[in-house]
Each structure stands twice: as C-alpha cells, then as structure tokens.
C-alpha cells in the first residue's frame, strides 16, 4: 500500500511543535482600514490551535 499523502493546504497553515499545533490568525489579509489598530495588533503573530480542532488537523497532516 502506498504512503498516505499530507494535505498540502494543511501543511502550509499549521506547524507541529512540542506544545501542540501552531497557526496564524485569520482576518488579517486585506480591507484592514475598517479594523481598529488594537484589533490588528491582537491578530499579529501565531497562537496554539484549540484542543477541539487538534484531532481534525492531525488527520489532515497525517500525524494520526
């Protein structure tokens, strides 16, 4: 049987770390003029994936 392929879209969006799965924030690509500076600042950087979504993303990344 051939190897299972990783979902390439998931591979681009999530990174496996020792603490869990890391991801970037959504809603930060365009039409940012309506958004407050505080909100744009809060959406910077990365955060850890919610526990309820981990199983689904791990299946997409073929970690499970």
Swiss-Prot record:
Region (Disordered): 1-64
GO MF annotations, alphabetized: structural constituent of ribosome
PROSITE patterns reported in the protein's UniProt record: RIBOSOMAL_L35
Pfam families per UniProt: Ribosomal_L35p
UniProt feature, compositional bias: Basic and acidic residues: 53-64
Residue ranges the record marks as coiled coil: none
Highest taxon, organism lineage: Bacteria
GO terms for biological process, alphabetical: translation
Ranges of biased composition (kind: Basic residues): 1-28
Keyword vocabulary terms for this entry: Ribonucleoprotein, Ribosomal protein
Family in the record: Belongs to the bacterial ribosomal protein bL35 family.
HAMAP family in UniProt: Ribosomal_bL35
Protein's name according to its UniProt entry: Large ribosomal subunit protein bL35
Species: Pseudomonas aeruginosa (strain ATCC 15692 / DSM 22644 / CIP 104116 / JCM 14847 / LMG 12228 / 1C / PRS 101 / PAO1)
């Amino acid at each position: 049987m051939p190897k299972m392929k990783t979902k390439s879209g998931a591979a681009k969006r999530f990174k496996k770390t020792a603490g869990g799965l890391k991801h970037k924030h959504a809603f930060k690509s365009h039409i940012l003029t309506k958004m407050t500076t505080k909100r744009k600042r809060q959406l910077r950087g990365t955060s850890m994936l919610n526990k309820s979504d981990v199983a689904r993303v791990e299946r997409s990344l073929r970690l499970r």
